[in-house]
């Protein structure tokens, strides 16, 4: 997508000469905007007949185009929005379409499958309509001015289309993560996890510390992710916050594994899961950090019960860990989306 042409201060680069040409031509034809709207829309369908399928009021209609009761209001809406945003472009320094309308336009265009080439069709139809309406006034400079104004509006809509696309991707990713949680954990895996947990849970205090130390042995920089460690000069084993934190993480991981199949999902209280997602997002946790915790977990359990350990048990605990990790990632994704929305809202200039 081409970026809007902008000046250093962020405003749209639409020249005074271009503005004068657009305003002059719009003043000459706006009293005839009703007929011109219909011509404009008819031209779109002449240039690209398949575009008819993109309009809900046309695609399943057997009524002749000129008799369709919804055609005129829609054509007027599109033509007037395009022309009026062009007239105000330089003065406003941006495309002047109400923000809620722009978001709706983006979502609708994305949903109906509008592509870059469709915007080129509307531009061609717009330029031909204006040229035929005021042939004595038409010039290459005027054509370029209207084309630039059209492209600015098109790019503003494309930005909102991308936002709609990203929101759908985020929603689908979260849904997939949530739907898959617990769905791939077999009865055999459950039995292995329960059996091994029953054998080690009474030693969970020591194992928690071993588990946490392994995380820092495998990935020493991970120390910076923990607020009680990153600025501490106290030896690890003397840190008063280490054991409670290690116990909390280890017990949550193991107990959610034991309950995974029966519950059909990760059984961590929803408020805790949201908090985990927010904290992991804030501290910059990445996928590779979850791989570190998995390795540390598997090594800790293997060393705790070597006589019981097997590839099947390793896979069972690995799967249980991944289910918990995915549940946390889903919450991280939600937090990220909320954060991006807040940043965008704050960065938008007030009207």
From Swiss-Prot:
Belongs to the plant globin family. Residues 331-351 are annotated as: Disordered. Binds 2 heme groups per subunit. This is Anaerobic nitrite reductase Glb1-2. Heme b 1 binds at residues 56, 70, 74, 104, 108-109. It comes from Medicago truncatula (Barrel medic). Its main location: cytoplasm. It is found in: Cytoplasm; Nucleus. The keyword Iron-sulfur does not apply. Phytoglobin that regulates the fine tuning of nitric oxide (NO) concentration in the cytosol in response to sudden changes in O(2) availability, and performs both symbiotic and nonsymbiotic functions. Exhibits NO dioxygenase activity in the presence of O(2) but nitrite reductase (NiR) activity in the absence of O(2) (e.g. during flooding or in waterlogged soil). May not function as an oxygen storage or transport protein. Monomer. Its cofactor is heme b. Keywords: Cytoplasm, Heme, Iron, Metal-binding, Nodulation, Nucleus, Oxidoreductase, Oxygen transport, Repeat, Transport. It catalyses: Fe(III)-heme b-[protein] + nitric oxide + H2O = Fe(II)-heme b-[protein] + nitrite + 2 H(+). One of its GO terms (cellular component) is nucleus. The keyword Cell membrane does not apply. Induction: Accumulates in roots within 12 hours after inoculation with Sinorhizobium medicae ABS7, at very early stage of nodule formation. Triggered in roots by hypoxia; this induction is enhanced by an nitric oxide (NO) source such as nitrate NO(3)(-), ammonium NH(4)(+) and S-nitrosoglutathione (GSNO). Up-regulated by nitric oxide (NO), particularly during nodulation mediated by Sinorhizobium meliloti inoculation. Its EC number is 1.7.2.-. Residues 13-162, 184-333 form the Globin domain. The gene is Glb1-2. One of its GO terms (molecular function) is oxygen binding. SUPFAM superfamilies: Globin-like. Heme b 2 binds at residues 227, 241, 245, 275, 279-280.
